[in-house]
Amino acid sequence: HKDLFKFILNTINDKNFCWQCNRIVSEEKFQSDLKYNKQFAHKIYPPLGLYNEHYEIFQLVLLDLNIEELLRMKLNFIPRTEKIIRHGFHIDTEEYSKTSILYFNTNDGYTEFEKTGEKVQSVANRIVTFDSSEKHLGTTCTNDYARLVLNINWK
């Protein structure tokens, strides 16, 4: 697992890895200044085109999750900010499923769950899994160049 994790981390940190800038959540859900409602993303599945060249690598992450159907897999690169910015509470999909978040770097950012108030700290190679109907939010970090996570929605 550590070798796979390191290989993926090197892949996404490569200067030729393609990221697209997009909004994190809808404007009405965002909890801070809208200028911070941005992240860079790389959609692994379903691919934006016919094929994503990195899909096979990331498919190996799924082996431990007992997945019957993959709905979505997306990398998020959330740039560092001077103070922690909380993004809005949201669900990833209306469809009954699970969400797993794999953290790629250790930093002071976190995932927070609305119902319980629990915060899961961003720790490299940690994965958290929960019902997709559970409202959650992510944050920026202040002590690394970015917060890097893989978001997986599955059944």
Regions of interest found by a model, annotated:
Residues 1-68:
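Non-heme Fe(II)/2-oxoglutarate
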Residues 46-155:
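Catalytic core of non-heme Fe(II) oxygenases with the double-stranded beta-helix
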